[in-house]
């Protein structure tokens, strides 16, 4: 686990891309194992949706559509952030 200061240093040194006003949804950093072994910021999809609902007053459906089109559908270079979608591990009753 890394602390906030180390995270900020890595972002600065590696010139990692961040989504504007979405810091609350950051869950970490990952390394893409391609020819560059590039580090990228990782966001939690559910937290992104909640972020837009809280900050912009969107409904759940509006925020889902916004994240799907404007975040998941965007490419902003080699350090485009990854979006983590968690697996629901709850067992049915």
Regions found by a protein language model. Name each.
Residues 2-93:
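C-terminal alpha-helical interaction appendages
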């Amino acid at each position: 686990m890394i602390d906030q200061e180390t995270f900020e240093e890595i972002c600065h040194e590696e010139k990692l891309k961040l989504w504007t006003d979405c810091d609350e949804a950051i869950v970490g950093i990952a390394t893409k194992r391609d020819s560059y072994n590039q580090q990228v910021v990782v966001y939690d999809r559910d937290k992104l949706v909640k972020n837009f609902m809280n900050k912009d007053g969107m409904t759940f459906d509006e925020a889902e559509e916004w994240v799907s089109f404007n975040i998941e559908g965007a490419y902003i270079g080699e350090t485009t952030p990854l979006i983590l979608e968690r697996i629901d591990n709850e067992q049915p009753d």
